[in-house]
Design a protein with these regions (language model features):
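Catalytic-core "active-site belt" of small-molecule-metabolizing enzymes
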Residues: 1-113
Length: 114
């Protein structure tokens, strides 16, 4: 299992919960509609990494800076910064078919912590 440092303590996140489509300028840039409710998706522990890669499985990756919170017992215990990596071409193909786009967001090393 991958770990992160939270307040100097090595921690193994049990799950990673992400909120998508929360930045209007980026929503418009991608030609998406602003959702009425927040879009939530998950990433597995294997998504955590610390080396930025430009490609995954031959596909170029897009990145977005994200504010990250560590939550324990219902409380935010730390804040940090990370990069959310996306297989944008695959995501577009899945969205056109009305399929979940988890494969484009939740692959190994798709969440870079800094």
């Amino acid at each position: 299992m991958n770990t992160i440092q939270v307040a100097g303590v090595e921690t193994t996140p049990s799950k990673i919960v992400c909120v998508g489509r929360n930045y209007v300028a980026h929503i418009e840039e991608l030609g998406n509609e602003v959702p009425e409710q927040m879009v939530v998706f998950g990433k597995p522990n294997s998504a955590i990494g610390n080396k930025l890669q430009a490609f995954h499985g031959g596909e170029p990756l897009h990145y977005e800076g994200e504010i990250a919170l560590a939550i324990s017992n219902g409380r935010a215990t730390a804040a940090g910064f990370g990069l959310d990596l996306t297989k944008r071409t695959l995501q577009g193909q899945l969205k056109k078919k009305g399929l979940p786009w988890e494969r484009a967001k939740a692959f190994d090393l798709s969440l870079i912590h800094i």
